[in-house]
Amino acid sequence: MKYQTLSGLLALSLLFGCSSSPDVVPDVPPSQLYSEAQTALQSGTWLTAIEKLEALDSRYPFGAYSEQVQLDLIYAYYKNDDLALGLATIERFTRLNPTHEKMDWVLYMRGLTHMAQDRNFMHDLFNIDRRDRDPEPVKAAFADFKKLLQRYPNSPYAEDAQRRMFALKNRLAEYDLATADFYLRREAWIAAINRTQELQKTYPDTEAARKSLEIQLEAYQQLGLTDAIERTKQLMQLNPL
């Protein structure tokens, strides 16, 4: 909840305080401004597209292009890595248009945007392992894609959402594994066992669940729990890495 509150405040401050000013965009008819925004979107000049779309949104909030402008902003913000602005626009659109025909796409984009929050360019560039970083954006993305599948099972975005959920599940399982390993290294044996048990229950079909048996075994050995040791060894034989 703290994560959602802070991110929401940040998004609102960005949306109303830091977005590009419509004053820099010439005062032209909305049809011309919309056409220029579409040209910028098609050419991938995201910042230009955003400036023109924001100007349209500000000057003509109830105009003929208002809904499509918001949808285009959602996409442009995502492509430009303006993720907080993207999420704020998604929430606004969802609140104003809960039954819109493109709500499946909006849910899909919310999932993609939350996934993008989990990315870190420097970590990807230098291949730094950050399995222990905050998983809240991943949980949010998983929930978005799950909601998409539940509400719109025949959506053209459903298949890709399902594939992404599989990857997100592995990411969450790796986080729990890293947490269990942290407890093990701190000699917090019970905490390590509890975390591995939770991992195995929640994500039983992941590699992280199989790896967690090694942590569980060591913790049981440190506690001298003979029956639990034997049971874990049997599970390791049945679930080899």
Curated annotation (Swiss-Prot):
Signal peptide start-end: 1-17
InterPro entries linked: BamD (IPR017689), BamD-like (IPR039565), TPR-like_helical_dom_sf (IPR011990)
GO biological process: Gram-negative-bacterium-type cell outer membrane assembly; protein insertion into membrane
Pfam families: YfiO
Membrane topology of this protein: Lipid-anchor
Transmembrane segments: none
Lipoprotein listed as a keyword: yes
Protein localization: Cell outer membrane
Keywords: Cell outer membrane, Lipoprotein, Membrane, Palmitate, Signal
GO CC field: Bam protein complex
Positions of S-diacylglycerol cysteine lipidation: 18
Chief site of localization: membrane
Lipid-binding residues (covalent, N-palmitoyl cysteine): 18
Recorded superkingdom: Bacteria
Function (record text): Part of the outer membrane protein assembly complex, which is involved in assembly and insertion of beta-barrel proteins into the outer membrane.
Family classification: Belongs to the BamD family.
Subunit description: Part of the Bam complex.
Name by which UniProt lists this protein: Outer membrane protein assembly factor BamD
Species of origin: Vibrio cholerae serotype O1 (strain ATCC 39315 / El Tor Inaba N16961)
Lineage of the species this protein comes from: Bacteria, Pseudomonadati, Pseudomonadota, Gammaproteobacteria, Vibrionales
